[in-house]
Amino acid sequence: MDVFRRNINNIFVIFVLLHLIIWTLVPTLTNQNLPLDTIEALAWGSNLDWGFNKHPPASAFFLEVLYQIFGPQDWAYYLLSQIFVIISFYYVFKLANKILKNSIFSLISVFLLEAIFFYNFTTPEFNVNVCQLPFWSVVVYYSWKIYHNKKIELKDCILVGMFAAIGFLSKYLFLYLLISIDLLFIYYIFFKKTIKFDFKYLIIFEVFIVLLLPHLIWLHNNDYITISYGLMRTGLEDTSYLDHIKYPVFFFLKQIGILIPFFILIILLVKKIKLKINFKDKKLIFLIFINFLPIFLMLITSIVTGSKIRTMWMTPFYLFFGVLFVYIFQSQINIKKLNSFLYGFLFLFFLSPILYYYISVSQTNKRTDYSGKEIATLVERRWSKNFTNEIMYVVGDEWHAGNLSYHLNSRPKWFKSIKDKIDNLDPKGGIVYTGNPDILKEVCPGDFGKIDKQGFCMIGSKN
C-alpha cells in the first residue's frame, strides 16, 4: 500500500494512457466506418460556419482541425474523443486532490468514472456530448478556485469565461452547469453573505458574451434554427398532460439504471454506508451544486415542459460524482482494504471494451458497418471517367453526403441544400447530389448512378 501511495500520479498516468490506447484501438480495429455523429460533424466542418441546423459549431471545428492534419484517417477521430475524455479525467483528478487532500482518494474518484458508460463505451463517437467533457471539467475546476481562494485571480475568471463559452458552443445544455454555478455564488453572496461580491466576476460574463457574439449573430440571421431543432428533439410539439409525469419518471429511472455499476463500486469501496452530511461544509455544498443541481434542473425542465430528456444528453453531468461520493464516505474508506474495489474496477474497465468489440464484430447492420470509403471510391472512379473538373460540393443528408465529403480526395464542401446558394458556388466546381434514387434519376441533368440503394447525381464539366 505504501508503494501504491507513493506512485499515485504514475498510476493515474498509466490509467489514462491505457484508457486512451484501448478506446482508440478497439473501434479502429472493429469499425468499418466512423459513427453517425462524427460523420455529421465532419460534414459541417467541411463548410465551417458559426453554427449549424442541429448544434453550435465547436464539435465541427475541432474535427475539421484534425481533418486538416490527418485527413480521412478514422483512428485520428477516435483518438480525439479519448483526448477529450482524459483531459476531463485530469481536471477531475486535480479538483479531487484539492478537495480530498488524499491522493489515493483522488485516484479512486477517477476510477469510479469507469463504472459510468458515458466515459468509456459511448466515447468512440466524437459528438457534441463528448465535446463538452473537457470544458465542463475545466469550468468546474476554475470555479472551485474562485469559490475557495480568498484572493480571486483575474486569470481564473478569464479561463472560466473562455471555457464556459467553448462549452456552450459545444452544446447549449452546458448552460445547466453554468446556471448551477451561478446559483451557488448567488446563494453565498446574497443569502449566506459569507462571500463578498467581486467585480472580477463580471470579467467572466464579459469574456463569455464576447466569445459567443459571432454565434449569437449567426443564430439571429438563421431564424434560431439550432434552438428550434433542440426543442423539436424534446418532443414539445406533441406533449400531453401525461408527459409531465411520464417523461420525468422515465428520466429519473434511467439515471438510476445508468449509475448501478457506479453504486456497486461504491458498495465495494464502503463496507458500511453511514451518511454524515454537514450542510455547513463549503466543500460539500460546492460538490452538491455542481453534481446534483444540473441534474435536478433537467428533471424540473422535464416536469414543467413535459419534454423527453434523451439519455446521451447527460454525458458530462456525472463527471464529478466520484469526487462527491468519495468525499461523503471518506471516513468509512479503509485504504488498506481496497482489493474488492480494485477487482470490481478492473472487471468493469476491461468488460466495457470487450462488449464494444463483441457488438461491433457480431452485429453487421450498424452505421459503423457502412461502406463509406468504398462508395466514395466508386463515385470518384465514375467521376474521373466522365468529367474533367474536381468535385467541390456534395449535397444531401449528413450521413450519405457527409461520408462522401469525408472520404473523397478533394474534400468537397457539404450542403444540406444549395437552394439560394447557387450564386455563391464556384461555377468550375463539380457537384454530387445524394438522395432517393427514384427521384434523382428523373431530375438528374448529369450522370446518374445507384449504389447501395442510394442515388447519386453527378454534375461536372465534360471533356
Cite the ranges covered by each PLM segment.
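Short periplasmic/luminal acceptor-recognition loop of GT-C membrane glycosyltransferases, typified by
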Residues: 178, 365-422, 427-434
